Amino acid sequence: ALDNPIFGVGMNNFYNNYFYYSTHWDGLNHAVHSTWFGVLAESGFLGLSLFICLITTTFIAAWKLLKNTDLSKLSPGMRVAVNAAPAGIVGFVVSGTFLTQGFIWPVYLQIALVIALQR
């Protein structure tokens, strides 16, 4: 991130650049094993800032939805979805610390779910 602080090394290029930045080369490229460092390496500080804003905004929206919705008026399935939305974001944040999942579809489905629930 320090060599390419604004835009990073580019999307899906962490693996290809591992050799250049690794202090210990064992002949294999490795995964970053952190969503946060993966996004930082591939999209720079600008991309990481936007990603954190996206996740934070989604969590706030999900939390407000949970607190401001009269759950008794919802169908059982919708009630479960409204209750699960903030938990899903928290689960992503925690697991994202140990897994590289910033550019795979489940987190974006979670964001879409929160947007759909608001409507």
Name these PLM-found stretches.
Residues 29, 48-49, 102-106:
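Alpha-helix N-cap/helix-start motif
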Residues 2, 6, 19, 54-67, ...:
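Hydrophobic alpha-helix feature that most strongly marks membrane-spanning transmembrane helices
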Residues 2-43, 64-73, 84:
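Long extracytoplasmic/lumenal interhelical loops at the membrane interface
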Residues 10-14, 46-49, 93, 98:
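Gly/Ser/Thr-rich beta-alpha loop segments that engage phosphate groups in nucleotides
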Residues 13, 31, 35, 57, ...:
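Short amphipathic alpha-helical segments
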Residues 87-119:
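Transmembrane alpha-helices of multi-pass inner-membrane enzymes
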